[in-house]
A protein has these predicted regions:
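Post-J-domain flank of DnaJ/Hsp40 co-chaperones
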Residues: 1-55, 86-91, 95
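Intrinsically disordered, low-complexity linker/assembly segments
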Residues: 61-186
């Protein structure tokens, strides 16, 4: 009984597919791959050449645009760069799953960056200025007299650009550390 239905429906679909002499167009499969990028590539974006092996085992170089602000867990879709379609169907897509590297001294939380800054005890007591490294270059930061170890200084617009809205920059939060030497503790 299954064979009868199989023959009837199989022939029906076979005839339907072959009516105009062609098979139905079928989109190629999407290909998934991991792409490791540097902290700087994630923060500032840019183009990167990657090499992949195609369906025929041939190495293929592709230029990939990395949008500024991308982060680990995001995906870049390259339309038409996946497996070949059949019957005139379009090619599948290449999905690149991003893993962004880290940078010593920086912690990233979305578009904001967190760093630490050691200042001398005398600067903490009397105030002054300190040079702070940012991904956009060094800045001079005002240190208020009496600042406490663990205090945070916000550097507005010194973080990472928002991938969703490139006109928005995150902030850099600098946690002040005041090393205490034993000479300052003597009574």
């Amino acid at each position: 009984m299954d064979d009868i239905f199989g023959d009837i429906f199989g022939n029906f679909f076979h005839q339907k597919r072959q009516q105009d002499g062609r098979a139905f167009a079928r989109k190629g499969a999407d290909i998934q791959a991991n792409l490791h990028i540097t902290f700087e590539e994630a923060a500032f974006g840019g183009d990167k050449i990657i090499t992949l092996t195609d369906d025929n085992g041939q190495a293929q170089s592709l230029k990939v645009h990395i949008p500024a602000g991308i982060d680990t867990g995001n995906t870049i879709r390259l339309r038409g760069k996946g497996s070949l379609g059949t019957g005139g169907g379009e090619n599948g897509d290449l999905l690149l799953h991003i893993t962004a590297g880290s940078k010593t001294g920086y912690e990233r939380k979305e578009t904001d960056l967190y760093t630490t800054l050691q200042i001398p005890y005398t600067t903490a007591v009397f105030g002054g200025e300190a040079r702070v490294q940012t991904i956009h270059g060094d800045v001079i930061c005002k240190i208020h007299a009496g600042i406490q170890s663990g205090s945070q200084i916000r550097l507005k617009g010194k973080g990472i650009v928002s991938m969703k809205n490139p006109s928005i920059l995150g902030d850099q939060y600098v946690t002040v550390q005041i090393p205490v030497s034993y000479t300052h503790l003597r009574a």
